[in-house]
Amino acid sequence: MCIRDRGYSPSELTTSFDDVLASKPDIFIDVSGPIDPALDYCKTLLGMGVHVVSANKQAIAAGGQSLIDFARDNKAHLMFSSAAGGGMPVLEMCMRERGRITRVEALLNGTTNYMLGEISAGKSYADALKDAQDKGFAEADPSSDVNGGDAGAKIRLIALLGFGEEIVLDDIPRDTIENFALTEPAKGAMKRVATCWKDRNGFSTKLELKDLSLNNFIAQADGEEAHAIFYFEDGDQYKIRGKGAGRWPTTESVMADLFDISATYF
């Protein structure tokens, strides 16, 4: 296991990627955050035929279709169901229903959903953020959550897997919740909704703050929950829900990917 924190016994862990390569792993699991060096590590291992399970949405979004193709060409499995939606099977739905999907509406960041709920209940932005950090939903540096960078990476994955569209973060109009405060009580529920859709004008996406009716399925996501609605060309809809923040939803998705690879290849 390659880890940044050097506070563990050297006999159990390593901070050297060379040690990982020397161990000749069958599967590599990436639960780091930044694009670098994670993307390079993944490419190196996939090139060796090592299967990769990744929760690193930023690295996978940056790698895009070329990374997926690279894994296939090297007969390695690349799985990243935990990279968007936490415990909600958003990416699985995208891959299964690609070609039928016309629109996706989703809450893709459980941290900000929790914070917006607390702010709507009367807390200040600072108190809501501290509470989210204390509960393990928000990182010590919450900038990617609040400015939409985290949700933006997930939107890129939905665009790629659900619509076959490769976009960059700057293509996505994003509302920030940094220092957000309600100027007047919400009529319904304040949510930051990610939307991707394709129509005769092409493909579009956005991340926006919305005051939703309480009857709306998206509005019914409480705390760190995440909800999504898939719309299909035949008029059908499919609604999914799950935990969108915290260590356990991510862990469950990582383990599910690991078990899938184990069942297929070992």
Summary of predicted features, one role per range:
Residues 118-119, 129-227:
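Substrate-binding/catalytic subdomain of NAD(P)-dependent oxidoreductase enzymes
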Residues 103-108, 116, 131, 137-140, ...:
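Catalytic, metal-anchored helix/loop core of enzyme active sites in primary metabolism
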Residues 14, 27-30, 53-55, 78-82, ...:
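General beta-strand structural signal in soluble alpha/beta enzymes
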Residues 15, 23, 62, 85, ...:
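Conserved active-site and cofactor/substrate-binding residues in soluble primary-metabolism enzymes
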Residues 35-47, 57-88, 92-94:
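Rossmann-fold NAD(P)-binding glycine/threonine-rich loop
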Residues 1-3:
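Short, small-residue-biased leader/transition segments that mark boundaries at the very start
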Residues 13-55, 59:
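Rossmann-fold NAD(P) dinucleotide-binding segment
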Residues 74-138, 149-150, 157:
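Rossmann-like NAD(P)H-binding beta-loop-alpha module
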